[in-house]
Amino acid sequence: ADSVQLIQMLFDGLMTCLADAEGHFERNDIKGKHESIGKATKILVGLQSALDFEEGKELAANLSDLYDYCVRRLLKANIRNDIDGIKEVRSLIQEVKGAWEMLPQILNKDVKVSMVS
């Protein structure tokens, strides 16, 4: 798997953890919710540590801020038993995940264009 695929796999895992956390919340499974949020937080930290600030500059900084916000929001949601926090993070991450899913198509187009020039 290349680096884009690895990042996509992290996003898939993150979305699964967030969905699991919501399910645990709805079933009043406090231990399960706590574990799922813990896993989601670790994945967010992993995504944040994979950012390339030299290459990505402003985009990397913005993603870092977003991941940091999501970690704080999940911790608050866990402490306050707030499903809306989990849903908010899930919605934010879904948008970023969607952009990563389009990246291979964009990269392939760039490669084809540069090969033609």
Region locations from a protein language model:
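C-terminal-biased regions
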Residues: 1-12, 17-117
